[in-house]
UniProtKB/Swiss-Prot annotation:
Name this polypeptide is given: Fibronectin type III domain-containing protein 11
Transmembrane regions listed in the UniProt entry: none
Organism in which the protein naturally occurs: Homo sapiens (Human)
Domain Fibronectin type-III: 210-307
Family matches, as PROSITE patterns: FN3 (PS50853)
Family annotation (InterPro entries): DUF5581_C, DUF5581_N, FN3_dom, FN3_sf, FNDC11
Domain of life the protein comes from: Eukaryota
Length: 318
């Protein structure tokens, strides 16, 4: 989106019949304004309406809020890439996996902490920018609904400045939606005597959250079947970590009804559960050395079925 909104291209706009945009209050205002002032008023008002229905529409803001909620559930990783790969070169001279052999482990751990901090700050800034967009739209929409013509005439410069500010916020928000490069102040490779070392870039990457399939997951009498999925399937298979625990254990022995299960698939059956009890399950990716931030994991509570009733046999008298 361009941040240039001065004039809003009003001299190039081909407006239809202005009367089609008028409500009764606007019709009353038309009687009070000179024809030239009225023309300027309607053109600027229509330009603002166009901005609020296209560049900053409620539907668009709703989509941004949904994307923001998704980003808060994603997992964030640090990627080590030679500069030519980070810039999009598809013919690697040095594979990323080989770079880890050259990197100082202690320095890499420090950079992971930097990646964690940068990710947290980025998410906080995105939330703040989205609030500014909500506030800016509400403010501009109130101007559009107001019968007062002054903001569109004598005070139009202030409105244009506000439009430019909101457009700049939108540009910053869209740019920050994509995780970027980590800023490295020092060399990650300690052994400078090694053969020619490529210029290394550290990038932040995002993985979509792991979510339980609530329709396919179910509890039976003494076992439960759990299924989960990732919105965008990874190119390679992933390892997961399934946790479970009994809610409200009543004895010391029942406190042992919990566990952590490594799983290499997207489904697993948890056995030896107690009947007629509630269990909480959580799912996440297995932790790797490149994970820097994972603020959320999906959880699901299931209730096992009770044991069948076993009563005395019924006798029938003739």
């Amino acid at each position: 989106m361009s941040t240039h909104v001065a004039g809003l291209g009003l001299d190039k706009m081909k407006l239809g019949n202005p009367q089609s945009f008028l409500d009764q209050e606007e019709a009353d205002d038309q009687q009070l304004l000179e024809p030239e002032a009225w023309k300027t008023y309607t053109e600027r008002r229509n330009a603002l309406r166009e901005f609020l229905t296209s560049d900053l529409s409620p539907h668009l803001l709703k989509r941004h809020h949904a994307r923001m909620q998704l980003l808060r559930k994603c997992s964030y990783y640090i990627e080590v890439l030679p500069k030519h790969l980070a810039l999009g070169d598809q013919n690697p001279l040095v594979l990323p996996s080989a770079l880890f052999q050259l990197i100082d482990p202690w320095k890499f751990q420090r950079m992971k902490k930097v990646g964690t901090a940068q990710t947290k700050i980025q998410l906080l800034l995105l939330g703040d920018l989205l609030e500014q967009l909500d506030h800016g739209r509400a403010e501009l929409d109130a101007l559009l609904r107001s019968p007062d013509p002054r903001p569109f005439l004598a005070d139009w410069a202030l409105v244009e400045r506000r439009l430019a500010d909101v457009s700049a916020v939108m540009d910053s928000f869209l740019t920050m939606m994509v995780p970027g490069r980590l800023h490295v102040k020092h060399r990650l490779v300690s052994d400078v005597s090694a053969t020619k070392i490529p210029h290394i870039w550290l990038m932040l990457s995002t993985k979509m959250p792991v979510v339980f399939d609530r329709k396919a997951s179910a509890a039976h009498q003494d076992w439960a079947r759990l299924r989960w999925f990732v919105t965008i399937q990874p190119a390679t298979s992933e390892q997961y970590e399934l946790r479970f625990r009994l809610l409200d254990p009543r004895t010391q022995q029942e406190c042992a009804q919990c566990g952590v299960i490594p799983v290499a698939a997207c489904t697993f059956d948890v056995r030896n559960l107690l009947p007629n009890r509630s269990y909480k399950f959580t799912i996440k990716r297995a932790e790797t050395s490149t994970l820097v931030y994972e603020p959320w994991r999906d959880s699901l509570t299931l209730h096992t079925k009770p044991e069948p009733l076993e009563g005395p046999a019924l006798s029938h008298s003739v």
